[in-house]
Regions:
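Juxtamembrane cytosolic amphipathic helices that cap and anchor the N-termini
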Residues: 3-16, 101, 206-219, 223
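Extracytoplasmic
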Residues: 9-43, 124, 230-235
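Extracytoplasmic gate region of multi-pass secondary transporters
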Residues: 28-30, 210-258
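Central cavity-lining transmembrane alpha-helices of secondary-active solute carriers
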Residues: 48-66, 254-259
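Primarily marks hydrophobic transmembrane alpha-helices of the MFS/SLC 12-helix fold
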Residues: 74-77, 105
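C-terminal ends and interior cores of transmembrane alpha-helices
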Residues: 82-99
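Cytoplasmic helix-loop-helix junction between adjacent transmembrane helices
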Residues: 108-144
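Helix-loop-helix hairpin linking two adjacent transmembrane segments in secondary transporters
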Residues: 133-134, 141-192
Length: 259
């Protein structure tokens, strides 16, 4: 079937979108101790990178409520992947180009966090709107791709570090940036249906007036913070706290958590 008419391609692009989000959230944490040794960062500065990533994604989630409906799902999801690609590429180059390594890292994190936040709010509704059979199975499989993407990030990156050396981490950062670039092109071609009829859509004021919304929001923030804390700091703890090698730390920490 044609890529422009088959919703199977839409679902596949969405799966790759969640893998992209896994790269955005979980690649840099594998390098926290490398950033510390190469760039002279403190643990407090590294912690702020994690906080910045999480906070910007939350902010983008809130701001996208109205923006997405006005602009459209396709341009927004394509832009999300371009932001992700730009951030991952910037991770490799900006710390050196700016002369201030920490400022470069923060700008890179800001870029890919914007992409990750948009992907988070766009991909599920896009799949939900696809006129396909077994939608429940497709949605369940969709959300599992974040975990499989997390595993892939750790395994592929660890294999690269073993073969090429941790000092060449900028190369694999650029290689990971190719994934969202390719998927941006993919999303520009696949069919995307409107998720909700505008006449039936709740206004932001109505949504904010529901107590259940605030309860679910609190649960999501707490769950997201816990997940980010575990996935992003497990490698550092295993390597520096337990004294194991980086390879064992990455496999036992973030990879084990993802599984």
């Amino acid at each position: 079937r044609s890529i422009r008419t088959s919703y199977t391609h839409t679902i596949l692009a969405s799966y790759l979108g969640y893998i992209t989000q896994a790269v955005v959230n979980n690649f840099a944490p594998l390098l926290f101790l490398t950033f510390r040794s190469q760039m002279g960062l403190t643990l407090e500065q590294i912690t702020l990178l994690t906080t910045l990533n999480f906070s910007i994604q939350l902010l983008v989630d809130f701001l996208s409520v109205k923006v997405v409906d006005r602009i459209g799902y396709r341009p927004c999801v394509v832009a999300a992947h371009l932001f992700s690609a730009a951030g991952l590429s910037a991770l490799a180059f900006l710390p050196q180009l700016l002369g201030n390594a920490y400022a470069g890292l923060m700008l890179a994190v800001t870029l890919y966090a914007m992409g990750g936040g948009l992907i988070e709010v766009l991909v599920s509704p896009i799949v939900e709107a696809c006129p396909t059979d077994k939608k429940e199975a497709a949605m369940s499989l969709l959300h599992s791709f974040y975990c499989w993407g997390h595993v892939a990030v750790v395994l592929v990156s660890t294999a690269f570090f073993q073969l090429a050396g941790i000092g060449n981490w900028r190369i694999i950062a650029c290689l990971w940036a190719a994934l969202p670039l390719v998927n941006a092109l993919y999303f520009s071609q696949v069919p995307i249906r409107r998720v909700v009829d505008p006449q039936r859509q709740l206004s932001v004021r109505s949504l904010f007036g529901q107590k259940l919304f605030w309860l679910l929001l609190l649960m999501m923030v707490c769950a997201g913070a816990a997940e980010q804390g575990m996935s992003q700091w497990a490698s550092v703890f295993a390597e520096s706290g337990l004294g194991v090698s980086k390879t064992i730390g990455d496999l036992a920490g973030p990879c084990g958590f993802a599984l």
